[in-house]
Amino acid sequence: MGSKMSDPLVIGRVIGEVVDYFTPSVKMSVTYNSSKHVYNGHELFPSSVTSKPRVEVHGGDLRSFFTLIMIDPDVPGPSDPYLREHLHWIVTDIPGTTDCSFGREIVGYEMPRPNIGIHRFVFLLFKQKKRQTLLSAPLSRDRFNTRKFSEENELGSPVAAAFFNCQRETAARRR
C-alpha cells in the first residue's frame, strides 16, 4: 500500500470532497460495454458510457450485501459545482461475489452528460449491515449528499471506490 498522498482517490479529490478517507476492504471492478474498464482518473467519452456498466463485487460472500452509488460531484461545472452532488445511480442488496445485476435498483442509471469542463464520475460501494437496509430513493438527483445518505441508511464508510473523468464530446471526438 502506498501513502495516502499517492492514492488516486485523494489526488482526484474524491476523498475529501465526496467521502472521508477510508481503507478499501473489497475489490470492485467497473466495466462499460464489456471492454471499457474504469481506472481511477482515466478519461472515458460520454458516447462510451451511455448504458449502465457491469459492476462486480469481488469480496464478501452471498450472505453479504452491498450498496452501489454513482455520483457526479462537479455539476453543473467543476469551477462552480453548486448542484453538487448529482446522483446517477443507486443499486442496493448486491450479494457479495456477484455483480449489480443481482441487486435492487433504487434509482435508475442516468448516463453522464457533462456540459462544462471535466467532470468526475464516482462509483462508491458500501457494505450493508443486512438485506433491505435502505429506506427509499432520494427525492432529487441534484444536491445529493453521499455522506448524509450513508449516515441516514447506516452504511458507514465505503469499502471500495472508483472514478473516471469525462467531458463533453465534439462531433469529431465521438467514437
Swiss-Prot record:
Transmembrane segments: none annotated. GO terms for biological process: negative regulation of flower development; vegetative to reproductive phase transition of meristem. The keyword Cytoplasm applies. Induction: Down-regulated at the onset of flowering. Gene3D superfamilies: PEBP-like. Expressed in vegetative axillary meristems but not in the main shoot meristem. The keyword Cytoplasm applies. InterPro entries: PEBP, PEBP-like_sf, PEBP_euk, Phosphatidylethanolamine-bd_CS. May form complexes with phosphorylated ligands by interfering with kinases and their effectors. This is CEN-like protein 4. It comes from Nicotiana tabacum (Common tobacco). The gene is CET4.
